[in-house]
């Protein structure tokens, strides 16, 4: 990756929070991916990264739906502040 395309760690984390908000608002990795212009696989990887960073699941995953967990619910106001 060349320097003009490199993201700072802070920027990367803001992107992860924006993706988190998109998944929470749409309830879907696929629809969130469309909103943030990424592949569904990239969105899933970002959510797994976020969960590793905070040490807890942020979503309850069910067939066809993503619902905020208690940890995700607590994270949401902070995510909105940083986006």
Q: Residues of each region from the PLM?
A:
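Alpha-helical linker/hinge and terminal dimerization helices associated
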Residues: 53-54, 75-83
């Amino acid at each position: 990756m060349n320097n003009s395309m490199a993201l700072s760690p802070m920027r990367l984390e803001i992107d992860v929070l924006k993706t988190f908000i998109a998944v929470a608002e749409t309830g879907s990795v696929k629809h969130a991916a469309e909103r943030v212009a990424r592949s569904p696989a990239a969105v899933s990887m970002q959510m797994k990264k976020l969960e590793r960073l905070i040490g807890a699941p942020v979503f309850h995953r069910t067939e066809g739906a993503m619902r905020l967990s208690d940890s995700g619910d607590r994270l949401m106001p902070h995510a909105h502040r940083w986006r």
